[in-house]
């Protein structure tokens, strides 16, 4: 859509040069202008109050070319320029696009900057091979349009890596956007508004993006993929947007030829971006999201992102074999519900704070999920038949993850990894791990596996919490075996003690007895069980995997346990 707007701006201002007259009114018929990006045609152009003479305008038009367009546009002064129909045609290889603008009006142009630009609507048809996509747009209105700056961005190449950006458009409003793609999918927006659009020329010509676009059914080769990624990364870094909002967004996905699923749709009541600069997005929100496609229908009240940066993913594509993901500082989902084949799931809130990113993952992460509620009745029984058998009709889960990597010390702190249901119980893990290589976060399988095997454990802790599930289990087991709950609990406590001893020792050891007593007490009615392990010299991941019993490592461990 940015390219469409840029072409629109460039087309309008180039045509004005052929119709301007010195402080007078002129008309011109059958205008055709050729640029490196497209060919523009207009059957009729009316110019009112032009300061530039007709002869001078024709001279500027004759010079043409990307190198002189911006300078020529800066000489345009006119009270009003009207174009009933403007046609833009772009061709590159087997790609062709035709855009038709209707009833274009440009008001109060001074030195190439217009107070306002409006069009009653426009249509787009793009063809590549046998594939055709079509778009229809309603009324367009823009203010503070800097035509010379737009020409520099769309027709020129960057002269230096740090070339400053210029504001191209102060405000934009576009109504009734409808785009249809060949597979039956499409996009619709009731209203799009934005402000403070800026940019600079790309390192390579913008027309190169069109030439490099993949062909239908022909995945790009590695070299083309890297070139496209480099240009997209440059484009993201070369465009600024103060704010952009969409109302009534609808994305329709069509069925592929080998997919029997019917088309589906995702709708959003409101979408907003703010602070888009240097490839980063300060904030992004999407509200009132609904999907009723062939998969499970869902609703989300709100999705929000801040500090979003997509450039690392494209930069990774430039390097052979590299992998990376977009980065963000904060993400949240609020008020979600999923139909899930008759077993609905709802989510109160999920928040994620991420810092100190490597290629694929952050090395500082705090995530929270509250009130993930799922039914255990009807079709929901399959989610946990064991809990359903104990009489639970739903789960209401909360979860947490808190970790941090100290790159200087190569030390990973797992501060919290937990899951809890206030009516069932909970589990929490924490620990400190050493010799943690950055390769663990690389996303490259071999490097991640080797890094995992190199880790040593300094400290680890486990907490189990009984909020009722263990009591229900004891009662159910007692009933099934014709015992009282007290007798059954005693048997289970003895079993827990024996299992703890078998896990922690190959010979009598008072430290193992402490663990066994705590495990027995937990089963016998205590609400919490805490186990902590400390290894002053560190225990390697390989040692843990090869040890048949923790008792083999007892001399390296400090163990404590209690139940309350």
Segment roles from a protein language model:
Residues 16-20:
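N-terminal signal peptide c-region/cleavage motif recognized by signal peptidases
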Residues 24-564:
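Glycine-rich, small/hydroxylated-residue low-complexity segments
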Residues 1-9:
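Bacterial N-terminal signal peptides that target proteins for export
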């Amino acid at each position: 859509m940015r390219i469409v707007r840029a072409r629109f701006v460039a087309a309008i201002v180039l045509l004005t040069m052929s119709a301007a007259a010195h402080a007078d009114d002129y008309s011109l018929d059958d205008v055709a202008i050729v640029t490196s990006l497209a060919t523009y045609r207009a059957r009729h152009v009316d110019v009112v109050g032009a300061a530039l003479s007709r002869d001078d305008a024709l001279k500027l038009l004759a010079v043409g070319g990307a190198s002189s367009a911006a300078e020529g546009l800066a000489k345009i002064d006119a009270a009003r320029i009207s174009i009933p129909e403007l046609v833009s045609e772009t061709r590159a290889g087997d790609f062709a696009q035709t855009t038709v603008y209707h009833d274009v009006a440009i008001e109060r142009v001074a030195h190439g900057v217009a107070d306002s630009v409006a069009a009653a609507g426009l249509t787009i048809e793009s063809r590549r091979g046998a594939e055709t996509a079509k778009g229809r747009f309603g009324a367009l209105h823009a203010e503070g349009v800097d035509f010379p700056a737009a020409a520099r961005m769309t027709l020129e190449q960057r002269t230096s890596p740090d070339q400053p950006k210029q504001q191209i458009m102060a405000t934009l409003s576009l109504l009734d956007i409808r785009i249809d793609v060949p597979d039956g999918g499409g996009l619709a927006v009731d209203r799009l508004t934005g402000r403070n659009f800026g940019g600079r020329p790309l390192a390579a010509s913008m027309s190169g993006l069109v030439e490099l676009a993949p062909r239908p059914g022909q995945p790009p080769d590695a070299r083309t993929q890297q070139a496209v990624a480099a240009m997209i990364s440059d484009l993201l870094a070369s465009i600024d947007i103060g704010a952009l909002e969409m109302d009534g967004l609808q994305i329709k996905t069509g069925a592929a030829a080998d997919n029997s699923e019917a088309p589906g749709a995702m709708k959003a009541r409101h979408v907003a971006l703010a602070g888009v600069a240097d490839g980063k997005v300060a904030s992004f929100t999407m509200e009132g999201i609904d999907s009723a496609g062939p998969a499970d229908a869902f609703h989300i009240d709100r999705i929000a992102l801040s500090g979003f940066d997509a450039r690392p993913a494209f930069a990774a594509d430039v390097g052979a074999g590299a992998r990376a993901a977009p980065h963000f500082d904060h993400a949240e989902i609020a008020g979600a519900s999923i139909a899930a084949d008759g077993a609905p799931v709802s989510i109160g809130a999920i928040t994620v704070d991420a810092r100190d990113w490597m290629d694929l993952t952050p090395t500082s992460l705090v995530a929270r999920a509250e009130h993930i509620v799922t039914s255990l009745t009807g079709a929901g029984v399959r989610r946990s038949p064991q809990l359903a058998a104990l009489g639970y009709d739903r789960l209401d889960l909360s979860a947490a993850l808190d970790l941090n990597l100290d790159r200087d010390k190569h030390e990973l702190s797992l501060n919290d990894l937990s899951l809890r249901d206030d009516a069932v119980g909970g589990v929490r893990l924490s620990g400190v791990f050493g010799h943690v290589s950055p390769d663990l976060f690389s996303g490259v399988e071999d490097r991640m596996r080797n890094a995992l095997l190199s880790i040593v454990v300094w400290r680890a802790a486990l907490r189990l919490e009984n909020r009722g599930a263990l009591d229900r289990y004891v009662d159910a087991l007692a009933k099934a075996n014709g015992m009282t709950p007290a007798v059954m609990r005693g048997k289970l406590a003895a079993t827990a003690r024996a299992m703890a001893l078998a896990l922690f020792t190959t010979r009598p050891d008072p430290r193992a007895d402490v663990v066994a007593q705590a495990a027995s007490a937990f089963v016998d009615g205590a609400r919490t069980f805490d186990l902590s392990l400390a290894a002053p010299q560190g225990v390697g991941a390989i040692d843990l995997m090869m040890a048949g019993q923790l008792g083999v490592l007892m001399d390296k461990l400090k163990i404590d346990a209690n139940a309350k």
